[in-house]
């Protein structure tokens, strides 16, 4: 019989997280070690998660004893932009559960983080992975790894049947599926199969532990929280995106050069993404809105600045599958470089399983609200409607209501 899809422990070491958490954490250590933040959990589809509270708490408490393994340190030391002082800090880092509140509120599971950004930043990914896997264990206790593996091979067959050899040689796909994975075992199996048998180009994973374990490239630069936090880190609101990008440039000196565009909107982002940033950053990441229309804006912006789009890369990561990735690839092929980060559709696509729609987002920085407006109304997030209205006014973003 095939192996179970579940291990006894859900998060088994400190690096079972997304790579951009480490890159942002280093930026926080060097630039904002005293910043305080708040985060709030949301289940977008209203699923009742109250029955899972006890096991969620149990798995959460087990984060206490996670540390950086000695065997993992040489792997991180080979990544040139992770500095020795940050790795020393990471070696000493421990999750502190006094920054976490979890319980029932208004007949729903609630989860809040409040504390120093430097000590809270690593909670997001393992907490979401815990909630997802605890729920999946309860609903699908007899799931076997073979069911996830077979589904993945069916996708490979589809891709071979619908893409030419030339397209397969150029189509780049990465695993971005940690936070809403079916289980840790399923993600590891999926990434292993992608590494060994993917018919196109498998370029890496966002999961640092799997990158270390399977000898593949860890991928990621920045998340929304990096830009959102800068709304309350000192500069005028109108200058917050510029401050976030400038701080990133100073931290990484041209490395990790994929910028996220939809914290406010693509139009607002491009207003700040001048020739200086357009030359320094290697490309842009799409995470909301219609992807090809977004790409056309990016291409036009580069051309307006006198930059050849074929020297830049667009990374797509918004709810993708292989079918949609191939469509986008074909629409943009030969005009700009593209790459695709696929999450839930790789790590939680099993017949009979409905993946979760859960997020854990920053709501406050230094005691004041932060917001993500995005290029998709459903992804707008802020606890303070007045702040969202003010941000729309400052960046001249029309209401989507």
Swiss-Prot record:
Family annotation (SUPFAM superfamilies): Nicotinate/Quinolinate PRTase C-terminal domain-like, Nicotinate/Quinolinate PRTase N-terminal domain-like
Matching CDD domains, A to Z?
PncB_like
Task: Tell me the InterPro entries matching this sequence.
Answer: N/Namide_PRibTrfase, NAPRTase_N, Nic_PRibTrfase, Nic_PRibTrfase-Fam, Nicotinate_pribotase-like_C
What Gene Ontology cellular component terms go with this record? cytosol
**Catalytic activity reported:** nicotinate + 5-phospho-alpha-D-ribose 1-diphosphate + ATP + H2O = nicotinate beta-D-ribonucleotide + ADP + phosphate + diphosphate
Q: Could you tell me which HAMAP family the record lists for this protein?
A: NAPRTase
Q: What is this protein's name?
A: Nicotinate phosphoribosyltransferase
Species, as recorded: Pseudomonas putida (strain GB-1)
